[in-house]
C-alpha cells in the first residue's frame, strides 16, 4: 500500500500526517503554537521556527504510533517548501529531506498553496478543473485549478490578505489571537448593519480585492468611539464580517466569468487526442461515482463553444483558514447557487494549515513521478503559477 508522509511548518502550526493511496487519512497531528504567540498578538517568526524544531520529532512519533506505521513503510515524504515564514519552512523541509536521505525515500517539495488548492480533491472527490477561492492569513486569490501544477491566478488582494484583516481587526477590538474565530463568535451577537464600512474596488470589473481600506475604516471608527464595550465590539465584528461577505460575493461573479474563459481557452489550445484522454481520465479518475456537484453543467456566464462544456464543473472551492468561517460559507454558498455553482469547502480541521493536505499533494505528485532533488532550495515566496517552472 502506498503511504505518503506529509510535513507542514510554513507558519505557526507544526503538522505531520500520513495518508494512503485511497485518500484515507491514517493520522493527522497538529501542534498549535497559539499560546506562544498570543502574548504578542500575532506570529513571531523566530519563535515559530524554534517551536517547529522542538515539535516536529514529537509530532512524527505520534503520527507513526497512531497510524501503526513504520518509517520503512513510507512510500515518499512530502513537505511544505514554500511559501511561508522562511525559518519554519526551512526547518520542516530540512527535517523531511533528512528522513528522505536516511530512509532512501523519494522527497517531494510541496507548495503550501497547492496543498490548500487540492484539499477538495482529498475530501470531496472533485475532478479538474474547478474554481478556487484561496482565503487565508497570508493570501486571498481566485484561482483556476486546471490540473496538477497547472494554475491560473484570476485575481488576488492588492494589499492585505483576508485572514490578516480578520486578525488585525480582532487585535483592534482587544480580542484573543487568532482573531478570525473570535470575530466570528462576536459577530453572532452583533448587528451587521450597525456600521457601514467601505468595500474597496468592489466595482473594478476584475477579480482583484482590497482589504486595507476596510481595516483602516474600522480603526478610524474605534478611535472615534468614547467606549469600546461588549455591545459595540459585537456590532463592529458583525459589520466587519458582513462587509467581508459583501466584498467576496461581489467578486464571485467576476471570478466565474474569468474562470470559464480560462477553462475554455485552455482546452481549445490542447490537441484533440489530449482532449479525448482528459475526458476519459475525468470519467475514470476515481473508482467511486463523482459527487453530484462535480458533474458538468450547461449554464455558464461566459458564452463559449461546446468544447469547454465537456470539462467545466459547477464547483467553487473555498480553502484556507478563512474557509472555516461558517457565516462566509453560507453567504458564498448562496452566491454560488445564484450563478449555477455549488460551494465546496473542506471540514474545519482541514481548512487551517495541516499536513494531510501536504501529504495528499504529495500523493498526486508521487503518482505522476514528480519527485524533487534533495538540494531543492525552500522559498519564502512561491506563486502557484510558478510551480511547474
Curated annotation (Swiss-Prot):
Binds 1 Fe(2+) ion per subunit. It catalyses: L-threonylcarbamoyladenylate + adenosine(37) in tRNA = N(6)-L-threonylcarbamoyladenosine(37) in tRNA + AMP + H(+). Fe cation binds at residues 112, 116, 353. InterPro entries: ATPase_NBD, Gcp-like_dom, KAE1/TsaD, Peptidase_M22_CS, RPE3, TsaD. GO terms for cellular component: cytoplasm. It is an enzyme of class 2 (transferase). Belongs to the KAE1 / TsaD family. This is tRNA N6-adenosine threonylcarbamoyltransferase. It comes from Rickettsia felis (strain ATCC VR-1525 / URRWXCal2). The gene is tsaD.
Amino acid at each position: 500500500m502506498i503511504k505518503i508522509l506529509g510535513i507542514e511548518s510554513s507558519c505557526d502550526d507544526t503538522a505531520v500526517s500520513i495518508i494512503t493511496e485511497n485518500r484515507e487519512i491514517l493520522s493527522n497531528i497538529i501542534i498549535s503554537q497559539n499560546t506562544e504567540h498570543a502574548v504578542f498578538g500575532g506570529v513571531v517568526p523566530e519563535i515559530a521556527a524554534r517551536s517547529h524544531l522542538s515539535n516536529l520529532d514529537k509530532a512524527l512519533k505520534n503520527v507513526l504510533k497512531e497510524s501503526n506505521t513504520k518509517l520503512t513503510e513510507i512510500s515518499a515524504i512530502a513537505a511544505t517548501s514554500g511559501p511561508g515564514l522562511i525559518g519554519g519552512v526551512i526547518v520542516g523541509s530540512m527535517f523531511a529531506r533528512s528522513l528522505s536521505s536516511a530512509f532512501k525515500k523519494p522527497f517531494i517539495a510541496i507548495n503550501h498553496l497547492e496543498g490548500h488548492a487540492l484539499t477538495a480533491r482529498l475530501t470531496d472527490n472533485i475532478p479538474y478543473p474547478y474554481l478556487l477561492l484561496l482565503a487565508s492569513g497570508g493570501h486571498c486569490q481566485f484561482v483556476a485549478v486546471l490540473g496538477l501544477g497547472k494554475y491560473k491566478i484570476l485575481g488576488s488582494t492588492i494589499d492585505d490578505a483576508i485572514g490578516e484583516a480578520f486578525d488585525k481587526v480582532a487585535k483592534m477590538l482587544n480580542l484573543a489571537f487568532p482573531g478570525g474565530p473570535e470575530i466570528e463568535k462576536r459577530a453572532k451577537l452583533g448587528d451587521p448593519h450597525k456600521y457601514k464600512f467601505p468595500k474597496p474596488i468592489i466595482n473594478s470589473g476584475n477579480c482583484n480585492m482590497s482589504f486595507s481600506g476596510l481595516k483602516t475604516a474600522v480603526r478610524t471608527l474605534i478611535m472615534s468611539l468614547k467606549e469600546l464595550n461588549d455591545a459595540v465590539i459585537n456590532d463592529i465584528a458583525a459589520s466587519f464580517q458582513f462587509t467581508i461577505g459583501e466584498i467576496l460575493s461581489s467578486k464571485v461573479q467576476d471570478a466565474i466569468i474569468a474562470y470559464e474563459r480560462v477553462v475554455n481557452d485552455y482546452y481549445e489550445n490542447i490537441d484533440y487526442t489530449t482532449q479525448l484522454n482528459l475526458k476519459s481520465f475525468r470519467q475514470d479518475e476515481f473508482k467511486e461515482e463523482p459527487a453530484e456537484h462535480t458533474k458538468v453543467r450547461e449554464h455558464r456566464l461566459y458564452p463559449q463553444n461546446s468544447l469547454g462544456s465537456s470539462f467545466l464543473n459547477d464547483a467553487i472551492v473555498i480553502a484556507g483558514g478563512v474557509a472555516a468561517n461558517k457565516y462566509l460559507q453560507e453567504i458564498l454558498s448562496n452566491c454560488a447557487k445564484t450563478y449555477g455553482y455549488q460551494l465546496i469547502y473542506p471540514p474545519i480541521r482541514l481548512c487551517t494549515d495541516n499536513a494531510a493536505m501536504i501529504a495528499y499533494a504529495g500523493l498526486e505528485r508521487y503518482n505522476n513521478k514528480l519527485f524533487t532533488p534533495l538540494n531543492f532550495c525552500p522559498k519564502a515566496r512561491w506563486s502557484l503559477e510558478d510551480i511547474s517552472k
